[in-house]
């Protein structure tokens, strides 16, 4: 047996008949035991996670890293306390707003000292006040545009005439916007005009009607009108007698006679007494030809004398 065992060569046996080493069997047995032990642990862990998720969904807890939801008091915003202004503070603020709608830092600090407020509160008040003023201006312009009138000076509109009406600084709303009545003025041109010239200037329709008057109706008006025309011509001759005599005795002048600049206001009367008498005898219609003023008959040299 020993010889047989000693003489027996294991290398000549096939691999299937060879005995396996003992350490390989131990490792395989250990791996099998570890896999069997791992499976129930994994199953228990998955079951515990599923139960935790179901409980969280049932209770309505938000899912987070720590499993704890945020504090609801932190989510709610803290409401700022409103500032209640007194009537004196509002009076100072409104008076400043009417003077300047965009005060700088120094002015806001002064207002804060006057009104016993902080500069931040004054700044916020002016910001809100400007927003209200712009909204009111916009509404007024829309109303005026609907009525068919577009204001050209919208910036001159005063804001909020119904607010703080009892204060003295807001008296602009009670002031009358109507202009002062036109005072009686003395016009030297019309006062210096003679009744004849004023009658001749503003009696166009009457003269036209007299010209279109039939000859049968004009007989009674001939003597009176002829006498008034004669008196006017005599007055003009007396006034311009001295100037005409000096013009006749003066030497010749190279300049031509100047034109009268006031041709519109020339007196319309008859040129001579003879033509008036002739027309009055013939009972013709009355047409007044223009009579040159005494100054127009003088030449340029006689103006200097």
From Swiss-Prot:
Residue ranges with Basic and acidic residues bias: 53-66
Q: Does the keyword Signal apply?
A: no
UniProt GO cellular component terms: nucleus
Known DNA-binding region? 78-137
In chain numbering, where does the motif OAR fall?
A: 271-284
Family annotation (Pfam families): Homeodomain (PF00046), OAR (PF03826)
- Superkingdom, natural source: Eukaryota
Chain span(s) of sequence motif Nuclear localization signal: 284-288
* Annotated localization: Nucleus
Map out region (Disordered) in residue numbers: 1-92
User: Known Gene3D superfamilies for this protein?
Assistant: Homeodomain-like
Tell whether Transcription is among the UniProt keywords: yes
Q: A single GO BP annotation from the record?
A: regulation of transcription by RNA polymerase II
Region Interaction with PIT-1: list its residue ranges: 138-270
UniProt keywords, alphabetically: Activator, Developmental protein, DNA-binding, Homeobox, Nucleus, Transcription, Transcription regulation
Query: Where does the record place Basic residues bias?
Result: 74-83
Q: What Gene Ontology terms describe what this protein does at the molecular function level?
A: DNA-binding transcription factor activity; DNA-binding transcription factor activity, RNA polymerase II-specific; RNA polymerase II cis-regulatory region sequence-specific DNA binding
Q: Family per UniProt?
A: Belongs to the paired homeobox family. Bicoid subfamily.
Q: What does this protein do?
A: Sequence-specific transcription factor that binds gene promoters and activates their transcription. May play a role in the development of anterior structures, and in particular, the brain and facies and in specifying the identity or structure of hindlimb.
Protein name, UniProt field: Pituitary homeobox 1
Q: Which organism is it from?
A: Xenopus laevis (African clawed frog)
**Gene designation per UniProt:** pitx1
